[in-house]
Amino acid sequence: AQYAGEFGPDALAIRHALQFPPEVVRRETTSGRWNDETVTAYLRRWAREAPDAIAAEAPGYPPLMFAQALDKSERFAAALAVRGIRRGDVVMVQLPSGPDFLIAYYAAARLGAVLSTLHMPYGPVEAEPLLRHARARAVICGPATEKLDLPAMYKALQAGLPKLDHVISVGPARHGVLSFADLVASGDCAALSGEPRADDPVLMCYTSGTSAAPKAVPHSTQSMLANPRACAPIYKLAPGDRVLSAPPFSHAFGIYIANLTLMSGATLICVPAFTPPSLAELLEQSRPTHAFLAPAHVAAMLHAGLLEGRDLSGLRLMIISGSYTAPGLKAAIEVELPNGKAIELWGMTETFAVLMGDPDEPAELRHGFIGRATPGSETRIADSEGRVLPAGEEGELEVRGCSVFAGYFDNEAANAGTFTADGWLRTGDLAVMNARGHVRMTGRLKDIINRGGVKFNPFDVEALIDRHPAVLQCAIVPMPDRVLGERACCFATVRPGKSLTLADVTGWLAQHQVAKLKWPERLETIDAMPLTPTRKIIKGELMKLLTARSS
């Protein structure tokens, strides 16, 4: 009722999903972790204090200065306002990481709209249900290419999406598609009224959907900014620093990096598209002081020898996150960083970064664990009955803190069981914590295989098979069995020129003294793993493939 006059019905529904428990609001506001600072406030600060400093740059784009970023984003926000986009409305963006994406993001934040993201590989099958579920009022996309005509795709979808009023493209205006550049140029800031509020929804990302359909995760400005603000001192970021973000801005991790860089007054180096050679070259040529990468980025460059002989002397800190980090990866990349260290970050779309390595800790801690709870976050390990476990015992990681979301939008089934009775988020990840709070991931609850009543976690077995000389990537999934209930099937992609048999796999595991009950009893080789846009293996797709091949 408090917001009924300020939000439309659909926007009000998203606002309703952001109802944090009163004790959470009290805890975070009293601590000062939640305050009134907004994305717009940070952008205005640096536009005022360092107008000609570079806010963002990307290959193929002119540099974007802080003053330009503020001016263009406010003009674009005004153009959206004139076209009926109001506070709480969803604006969906399908753009590569770069200045255009940031202008759209800053504009939505200034307007009080909710930014929702679509990954670049998405076509109509993936985009349509998310646009419908989000009740998107506008979508901003790239130009037509030989591979996919995004503006035409969205115009075709618009006929079946009555909420979708506007299709905006960074390409030329055509067929009822508005031009992003024209809107930025014509926007009149006099059309803007009011200021964004820090407790309003500002971002709604969809989970990667490794085992189920994507779920919508709304965040307020407070829950979105509290975490990078608390973590900034650990990174030792300052104006003049240069931050490379390989994770795409369509992912919550990419937005986290963009916010961290903005509030620090540093320069954001964007990566519009990833190939191992181009990323290796950008790491050298752009001279970052900090680089955020996914494990797949690092592993691909190391495997191909693409970093050998490159001058990475200016890189002080490499932060690895986004999926499972193989043992030895952080130590291996540090060999290429004469003046830098590698740490790991762990989080979820629902939480942002809640575990983080400390660059000032010894290598054995940085390399052997993800890290400890970030400032403003708490972690614990619980068993299947919800009992909190002592140090050293494996159980489910549970978290709470300043950046944990309030619940999924329009998905009561997903919300059921997400939080414990005392308000901790159940992550679904298995982990072990030592006496000092350092956490090491050991698997996913959903990946547990129940072989005749004996349950085992395939996580460590997968990590070992990944080290086989013939294996590029592997994943173990359960397969139905009439006698035992479940057995284990290993899917693997094989290195060029190599071959792999089940006997090779089991022999490798025997050589490394893995208990036979954990050995896979079937091997399926495939050309490529089904991956989310953030390069996580979609085990649900592998199980469908297994069913199809079995039948």
Question: At which residue positions do the language-model features occur?
Answer:
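Structural core segment of the AMP-binding/adenylate-forming
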Residues: 1-9, 82-83, 113-182, 496-498
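Conserved AMP-binding/adenylate-forming core of the ANL superfamily
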Residues: 35, 44, 52-106, 123-128, ...
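Conserved pre-ATP/AMP-binding loop-to-beta segment of ANL
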Residues: 36, 51-52, 169, 175, ...
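Conserved AMP-binding A3 loop
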Residues: 63-67, 202-226
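Conserved AMP-binding/adenylation subdomain of ANL enzymes
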Residues: 112, 225-242, 250-290, 304
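AMP-binding/adenylate-forming catalytic core of the ANL superfamily
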Residues: 122-132, 139-141, 291, 401, ...
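Gly/Ser/Thr-rich phosphate-binding loop
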Residues: 263, 288-293, 302-365, 378
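Conserved ATP/PPi-binding loop(s) of AMP-dependent carboxylate-activating enzymes
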Residues: 372-376, 387-418, 456
